[in-house]
Amino acid sequence: MAFNIESLLEKKSNPVEEGNDFEEENDSEKNGEEDEEEEEKNVIDGWTNMATSQLAMFAIANDLRTPTLVELQMLLGVSARKHDYKRSRKSVCERKPRQAYSARQLDRLETEFQTDKYLSVNKRIQLSQTLNLTETQIKTWFQNRRTKWKKQLTSSIRQMVKDAPTSTSVGVPFQSLLTPPTPPTTLACHVNSLFACEQ
């Protein structure tokens, strides 16, 4: 039996009216349909495997990147799964209020941060006892301070690069920092010539 839309939409007759002939015919049709479905599945799997391997070979041959999940979904006509759940988050009333640090606490924390960006467990325990804060509060303060420090560092580097053609860094033109280092033999000769000039 051919698989098409009409066969699906046809109203099937009642098997009781047809009798045993229908059951025998139905069994043979089922076996035939199962064989056809299995054959179609094998053909589809074969095409899918071939298309996948050809796509991969094309990508390798042309030095292309692997497609992203979204690109594959668009290519295959599969929509992205929509999630109906939301991340659970503590309500505002359940959350602890922000820690208000005293000037003395902030000064000490800043001093420790300038000394070392990462605290040891012993140092954290000592600070918590000295400043009357919990270890978690100190740990969180240091994490936040490191984040701020990294942002400031990135910003200053960007500014330095932006101003590079006109400024110098420690007496060395910025452009020379971008050039490859001088080979050791030339550098040694240069250093020797400098010492020779001083004598």
Swiss-Prot record:
Disulphides: none
Acidic residues bias spans: 18-40
SUPFAM superfamilies: Homeodomain-like
Region (Disordered) residue spans: 1-42
GO cellular-component term (any): nucleus
InterPro entries referenced in this protein's UniProt entry, alphabetically: HD, HD_metazoa, Homeobox_CS, Homeobox_TF, Homeodomain-like_sf
Keyword Isomerase appears in the UniProt entry: no
Localisation: Nucleus
DNA-binding region: 94-153
One Pfam family of this chain: Homeodomain
Function: Probable transcription factor. Required for MC motor neuron differentiation and function, including role in modulating pharyngeal pumping. Regulates gene expression of FMRFamide-like neuropeptide flp-2 in MC motor neurons. May act downstream of transcription factor pha-4.
Name listed for the protein in its UniProt record: Homeobox protein ceh-19
Organism this protein belongs to: Caenorhabditis elegans
